[in-house]
Amino acid sequence: MKKWKKNNKIACSTMVLVMLMAGLSGCIGSDDSEETLRIAFSVKDDYASFDENPQKLADYLSDATGLNIELYPITSDSLALEALRFGSADMAFLDGGAAWMGWQSYGLEAMAADMKSDGRTYYSAHAWVLNDSAAGQAALDDDDATDPFAELAGEVSCHTGWLKSAGMLIPMGYFIGQGYADVVGDEDDIESLRNTIFSHFSEDASIPESGSLYYGYSGALRCLSEGEGAVAFAKDSTVDAYCAADDDERESWCLDRDRYVALPAFGQAPSHPLMYQPDTVDDSTRELIVSALLALDDTEDGQSILENILNTPGLIETNAEDHLGSYGGLIQHVPGIQGYLDEKYSSA
């Protein structure tokens, strides 16, 4: 009987020891302690080469940060935004509208932004007029008492399309926010913007459909050049892109380059920021990721990722206020913009 009790004690002690060792082993060698972050990214079924596969970006970030970075496949900005909102992903590159909505409505933040071809992370939105117009003369007379923007009331406006950033949302946000134009209709209905344009400018305002003659940046500038309108809303580089003085391939409808006058910029349209969820990405993790992204330009492989996967010459560190503040401060005045963006970026 005593022998049985002794053997039972040994067996129990052995079992406890095994359990303790197993638990200790789990604490020392378990992968559960390794932080996993997911970046929402549009993926395809196959790629011509691995250089185009976003998995290469995830692998690079994992190696550079020591974190486990995984892809979360999405097919649209709306799905990326929803993934960030509900915790399925921690980071995503978003367009300006989706990023601003995520910042304002869901508390997302920005850690980086991609550069455009000229190295900037934005482009400026302008009203372009002709130098012999009232607005053009007011812009060139060096007289602070004259207001070129006030001269545009009642003139036919040339927009790049319905609800385009530089061609409509930014300039109309400026005119409404600065008190030049009054909203006509329900302030919670995006369609009121159309009536506001017709009321402040002209019922003949050009708001073209995709594919029509005056659609896009070139279309808005052509609308101005051919006398169909008195002001074209476009970006800072539009005139030189199509009507540069020394360009042999300038468009046939272009006027002399010095005929075009840009009024002071309304504001900036942002490039794509890398937005993140502050609830899951702390400051130290953000710093690791930003450092890795900024270092992409230092190696040939990194430059390949920038060119073939991110489609940008480089990235900069930023935050939501710096990158989206100018844009959001303008478009918030557009009637119905919040509801429109809610619907546009709601998960399908």
What are these language model-derived features?
Residues 38, 42-43, 112-126, 185-207, ...:
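Periplasmic-binding protein-like
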Residues 33-50, 67-73, 155-158:
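Short, well-ordered beta-strand elements
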Residues 93-107, 174-177, 217-257:
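A ligand-binding cleft/hinge motif common to bilobed small-molecule-binding domains
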Residues 57-65, 153, 165-213, 245-250:
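Ligand-binding cleft/hinge of the Venus flytrap
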Residues 34-37, 45-59, 281-348:
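An extracytoplasmic/periplasmic, membrane-proximal ligand-sensing/linker region
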Residues 1-33:
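Secretory targeting signatures
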Residues 71-82, 95-97, 183-222, 226:
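Short helix-initiation/N-cap motifs at beta->coil->alpha
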